[in-house]
Amino acid sequence: MKYYNNILETIGNTPLVKLNKLTAEIPALVLAKVETTNPGNSVKDRMAVKMIEDAEKNGLLKPGGTVIEGTSGNTGMGLALACIIKGYKLICVLSDKQSKEKMDILRAVGAEVVVCPTNVEADDPRSYYSVSKRLAKETPNSWYVNQYDNLSNREAHYESTGPEIWEQTEGKITHFVVGVGTGGTISGVGRYLKEKNPNIKIIGIDTYGSVFKKYHETGTFDEAEIYPYVTEGIGEDILPKNVDFDIIDHFEKVTDKDAAIMTPKIALEEGIFVGNSAGSAIAGMIQMKDMFKKGDVVVVLFHDHGSRYVGKFFNKDWMRERGYVEPKNPTAKDLISTEGNLVVANSDESISSVIEKMTKFNISQIPVFKGEEIVGSINESIIFTYLFENPNSQSNTIEGIMSDAFPIADLNTSFENISKLITKDNPAVMVKKADGNYHIITKQDIIRAIS
């Protein structure tokens, strides 16, 4: 029989899933490390168990003890599972900006939840850092986890997450992208990957209101960078010991709005139901798209499950109240409705062959290629006129009768500019995708978009 002795043994070995739609404008292969398949539905399960086991080995956590931690919810869930299996009590201290779902889930697995105000300084006695420390002092036989400065956090990812990514990509990974909060994931994974290949780029996603990016670039801890933000799970107003800035190559900041808008898109367009930090990561990658090239293998880590955010980022009323609504300025990417293969003709192809293609696929215009180069276009009106004037000439090639090539746009060309390119004499526009292939937008696509 094959079974696990307890739920903690199921942690790890999470899948890599190719992203297909959201990252279409990124020329690289983009793979999501989906950590929601861990039993606590987040990457934090890995380090929660590691921190508890190391505390046990070092005599810091004794039988029947109480585990105390300040958490955004996910570490608390991992700790809760470990405490259930190992027989400890758990007190989780959360800031009031965390979703109600996170608090309810922690209570459901036996944790005592203490809620603190968000908009106070880190050293304020009301902050969740200060309250966690105070509770640890006041509670007999307790242990304060301190995931920010507890280096077992990043060791967990050095020992498990990093090796998994290296093995799953067969060592072909070129970039690792992840949101940064405590710094354990990026530092542990980053160190492992850099040891395997120093050329791998380690990229942290930060948020506005956090100190990470400026500190990384200037070495200055600037309190002016600190202000309230909505994004959950990433960014800090402190410098955790787990953040190894020497390993990180670049920080990219993402706004609350961009992260919020992207979060439900991951579920709707990729079928992957994940949380707000994943939205930040994808939005950040799109901002950095010029950093990646064809042949790169980019792994982006999705921290946690979308169920923790159904009352916020997946709630249209909540999003609308905060102005987190995507502006209605569609681009060529939005007009591409299918992912079927483009029907093309070769310049030396016969007229009869092109007629067969038009009939088979129910289309009225076709781009003409010579090798890999677009050299012209052909449509049913041109063919009709030519055959009317030149009967019995279906065997002739289209090279002598084709029109100019359709204009070429990129995925970000606006709907307005696409519309201007389509005229009576020019019935279609070619759109070049990030992978070098083409798609076609016709008059019918424009009509469908505005009707």
What are the roles of these predicted feature ranges?
Residues 364, 376-383, 438-446:
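Short hydrophobic beta-strand motif reused across regulatory alpha/beta modules
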Residues 60, 373, 436-437:
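Residue-level signal for well-ordered, solvent-exposed loop/turn and beta-edge residues enriched
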Residues 343-362, 369-370, 387, 408-427, ...:
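The conserved cystathionine-beta-synthase
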Residues 1-331:
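PLP-dependent amino-acid enzyme catalytic core
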Residues 380-399, 446-451:
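A short, polar/charged loop-to-alpha-helix boundary motif
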Residues 47, 51, 336-338, 358, ...:
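Methionine-biased hydrophobic packing positions in alpha-helices, especially
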Residues 247, 328-342, 395-406:
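Bateman (tandem CBS) regulatory domains
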